[in-house]
Amino acid sequence: MIKISKRNGSSLKTTLYYVRLKTYDNNQLFELEDATAVDTSKTHASLAKIVADELLQVSVHHRNIKLDQWVLEPNSLHALISVEEDRPNLEVKGKPRSLTSFIAALKAATAKRINLMRNQPGSSVWQRSYNEQRVEDEMMLMRLRKKLSESEHVVIAG
């Protein structure tokens, strides 16, 4: 989904991406456990809240990034993210720099806080890379929004 908008007299290209981050070794970090395991359940819920808080916080600091919809599952984060590109006429191959920067900041902030909470400094929280897919049209956007809203394993969503 691409649209051109004007901000301060310059053209911007806005592109929507579906992004998926997976936990390291597909660990179920954010899974809510059996109610009898109160301490474990609280830890998982707290880790999920860290990711939710940092997702919102990091998006505030990246002016080119807007969160459309997101879902945190036990071992992954799925999000629809719009990216405004300052130079739409510049042909750039690969992942958009502002999206990559946003993901790197999110991973670093969440990993630091999660590792402090687990008392495991330096441990891997997320897989090295992430998956992204450009949303090409309204049908694809509707399908992805439905997929996110109907996910069976949602721990927390926004």
Regions found by a protein language model. Name each.
Residues 1-158:
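Short catalytic/metal-binding and nucleic-acid-binding patches
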